[in-house]
């Protein structure tokens, strides 16, 4: 017989020999025997040799032996007869404790050939242990004031046997005050207790002696008893009461020392000392409980003071009592059940297998990215592992098999929003506390070309000065692409188009990489004011994506054009203009008018006129209008003035720096009786039939002027009568004006009937204004094709400024400044136009416009301007504001060609007479000259 407790020097060799022979030697078997505990030495167990099929004669030669893992002296085999018998006393409670099953395992080994047999000998329990109470006597102190059905817990008996042998029943000795409350089978945790069924009276029965008997279920029955000494207390009639009779707590087996287990709470309805509670374990608590737990007497807190071992004890039942300080003291009882929980000491393990990394951003949902396997060496709940993913979006974990997961794409990706994800896979077991392990997964998102280059704004406005050097950098376009690498590599190009007769690429170019826009040639504001084109941005992706941006390049004007004089048809030698002026003219008489044009625009084309001083500081009786260019007398001429004057007129613009031009006017003073045969008074730049005036008979002019004066007086009288009549419309009324043009060579008129609202202001007239229509008399195509003016006719900036001080009707416009030049337009509001849509823009300061002026108006339904070389439908010769007198004609009346509109100018009719009153012919001649001067103005 060989047992592990004995020392066998050849055991290692034997074990090695057994392992080698086990590969080819068979012959294994298993036998079951049973033996009651407490069997005496030599008690028969079984015929082991016969049951194993071995001959008695071969037991010794084959080295028959039985090996046990525990005590080797309990069983023995007789090699002579092959019988297994009891060798020493077997105590089941000592061998297996309170385990439900108890057996002795033997390994029977025979050699030649090697055979191993397993034999299990079951040790059956017998009722050899009586019930035992913790103490032979239990003292109980019960107040006489305790109510009926009060329960007093008792510590039950314990039986070392198992099964029916440990099933206990209790009985109490007969009495009239108490009965025994025995918990049912499903209330094993609930302690045994005495229940009061009759009120106690200390004066009648101060003490009670009862006997509690416990009987097991064995055969024969065994019993145990305890003496119950009950002392009846007086006065303190309220015992402490716990919140619960049973507290259940779970503690892990590796709980640290000093950990609070529970804080049971008891309350006492008494006051003073009778309500002060002291906590303690019950007097009959086991020493094992006292070695592991401690209870604070004042707070009742139970803490851990010893090591907890799940394998040693899975639960601890702690009886607790709360005793007040009354006399006699009262006690409340409860039970604390501490369940020891096994510790989860193995964390899960994760294994990752990457399949498709990096993942393209256009991958479809459901694409598998990584395979994950988990493993936990624990068992039960502690080995059940679940996986989770953080962050979840846009991925998810899919369980494919037990402990196997797939990391798949859950929603669409966008590399431009998130280019990479750092995912954490957490594997957590079901233990308490749970253990976990984590693994990081780096998911990189590969870029695809899904974003076109984008500009910051759809269009840009660029201002470039004209006359820039070739290759000048004018702007830089920049487009951003949210993609990466070559998908974000942006190149720029022009969207080719035609600019007039030339290609766009002849004006500008764009650098393909930097997006810088260059002007390939000097830009000319007079030729090109606005250059609008598109720049395209394309990335290098496959397929390439792109977008366009619009550039509006405004060419800013510079003062690069000097004023140009408009040459007259009849002039003096050397480019000078000759003018003949009678000595009889008074102050303010217009001698000539210098006309010039500037190809620039804005202030660069706004012209002013200055009269250069003569040498030696001599004064001359002439001046020039600052913005009109009109040369007029500053005083009345007399005999002391030089007969000839050379006037130098400086024309300059308002640019920076200012550019100038010079005009020479030769003025000759003649006597009043001499005819100005070669006068060019019409001013520089005026062309037309006025030059034919030189050859007209002076007497014919005097006759025409006389007839015209009579007609004017008639019209003024008629108009005054008409205006004095009451009007239903007040100051503004609808009339039919008949507009007639009168010139120095006669009257040429074209009646144009139109219903208009004319508003006349109040106040005395200050000067003459004559309105006329440039239309010809009624004739073939005269209505549609008005007479063309001299192509040299242009309005300069000064003339345009002067026109702002004139009264202009609805169809008034401004002529273009010159060929290729910009339109100098100052929109204003006309008092003859009631539309509120008309814009209001003031002309430049100093342009000759005051707050009382009637100015041009552009608005819906009003033509802006006539084309180059055309006269406007109606215009006003510049002058100061005056009261307009308009003749009204019946609807069907015939309009005579001699009908015209004129404005009275009393100062011309009241000239100082230098001749005798009887010389009427000379007076008429002067009136004719005055009329001619007015027409020039």
Curated annotation (Swiss-Prot):
Domain of life: Eukaryota
Glycosylation site list: 254, 265, 548
Stretches the record annotates as Disordered: 755-795, 814-937
GO biological process, one term: nervous system development
5 X 4 AA repeats of P-X-X-P: region residues: 774-881
Extracellular compartment spans: 30-697
A Pfam family per the record: Cadherin
Topology relative to the membrane: Single-pass type I membrane protein
Cytoplasmic side: 719-937
Alphabetic keyword roster: Calcium, Cell adhesion, Cell membrane, Disulfide bond, Glycoprotein, Membrane, Metal-binding, Repeat, Signal, Transmembrane, Transmembrane helix
UniProt cross-references to PROSITE patterns, sorted A to Z: CADHERIN_1 (PS00232), CADHERIN_2 (PS50268)
Protein name (record): Protocadherin alpha-7
Taxonomic source organism: Homo sapiens
Organism lineage: Eukaryota, Metazoa, Chordata, Craniata, Vertebrata
